């Protein structure tokens, strides 16, 4: 009697090593699945900027623009309609994003540990043979495509008539753009923010999957903490890689570690977008989890900003939003009660 595929995999598991950190080689398993779907081996994938699907700025901009049209148009369509429950589809959405993130993270880990151990950190983040191998490029590309799946997060918010906040909408659109710029920019340091992001997403989407099941989990606050830690580490690596690139290229008299692979526009995009994430998520954390102190601070302002919905265009054009009236020399306007919510449904 022949063994089942699961028995074969379990039988192949050996003691973990540097080249086989999980006790079994994951790439051959991924190779079989990828080949069955695409008809060719993943290592034969040839990413060509402006040729490979979704590798042009026009395509990326069109999809991001469509995303914003859909969510804001959808909000208008849902204005006088009851909210959908969608608990089942929401559970499925969060479960498959948890699974995808976990699988990609495991594949990245298997590829990177031998490089880090044998060649060192600088080689892994700055040399094309370290951070831009054929195996890593296909993983970068697949990770980039998942950013468009994650846009469905906001569609659930719209259909469930949840508020659309600036942080949520900006973060989702900007992340798709960020992954595009790094993929086109051939930045070998990309694996650092990507693997950290995948790790956070495994935790985050699993949390929301369990929440949709009605299970209360106490560590929700730690998701935002992990995101902030992620952005800090990202910026350390991205700023270092950018610094050593620019100094070794244009300011050779300054201390530097040598050349670092990647395009200049990708460096500026990475530094700018991730820096904005750090500032926004710190503000979100303070506004959501830190109580106001006795002394006046910026926390109340941060909380107001965090809870504010994005402008309602229909209400503005129809003249339903009136300018604030002044009373006793201070601007005062009637506002609805705050709606506290996280960045997810």
Regions found by a protein language model. Name each.
Residues 1-193, 211, 215-229, 233-338, ...:
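Membrane-helix and juxtamembrane interface regions of eukaryotic multi-pass membrane proteins
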Residues 195-205:
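Generic alpha-helical transmembrane segments
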Residues 208:
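Surface-exposed charge patches
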């Amino acid at each position: 009697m022949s063994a089942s595929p699961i028995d074969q995999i379990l039988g192949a598991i050996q003691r973990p090593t540097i080249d086989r950190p999980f006790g079994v080689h994951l790439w051959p398993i991924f190779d079989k699945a990828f080949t069955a779907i695409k008809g060719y081996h993943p290592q034969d994938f040839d990413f060509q900027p402006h040729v490979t699907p979704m590798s042009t700025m026009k395509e990326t901009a069109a999809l991001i623009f469509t995303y914003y049209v859909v969510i804001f148009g959808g909000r208008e369509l849902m204005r006088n309609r009851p909210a959908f429950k969608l608990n089942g589809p929401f559970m499925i959405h969060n479960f498959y994003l948890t699974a995808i993130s976990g699988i990609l993270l495991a594949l990245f880990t298997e590829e990177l540990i031998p490089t880090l151990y044998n060649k060192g950190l600088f080689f892994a983040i700055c040399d094309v043979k370290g951070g831009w191998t054929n195996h890593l490029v296909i993983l970068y590309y697949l990770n980039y495509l998942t950013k468009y799946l994650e846009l469905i997060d906001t569609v659930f918010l719209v259909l469930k008539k949840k508020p659309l906040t600036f942080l949520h909408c900006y973060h989702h659109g900007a992340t798709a753009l960020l992954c595009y710029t790094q993929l086109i920019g051939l930045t070998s340091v990309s694996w650092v923010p990507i693997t950290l992001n995948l790790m956070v997403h495994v935790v985050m989407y699993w949390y929301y999957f369990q929440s949709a099941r009605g299970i209360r989990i106490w560590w929700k606050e730690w998701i935002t903490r992990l995101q902030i830690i992620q952005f800090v580490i990202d910026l350390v690596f991205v700023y270092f890689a950018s610094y050593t690139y620019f100094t070794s290229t244009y300011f050779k008299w300054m201390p530097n570690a040598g050349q670092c692979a990647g395009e200049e526009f990708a460096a500026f995009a990475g530094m700018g977008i991730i820096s904005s994430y750090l500032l926004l998520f710190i503000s979100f954390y303070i506004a959501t989890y830190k109580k106001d102190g006795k002394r006046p601070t910026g926390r109340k302002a941060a909380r107001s900003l965090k809870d504010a919905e994005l402008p309602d265009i229909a209400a503005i054009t129809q003249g339903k939003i009136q300018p604030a009236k002044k009373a006793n020399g201070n601007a005062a306007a009637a506002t609805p009660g705050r709606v506290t919510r996280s960045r997810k449904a």
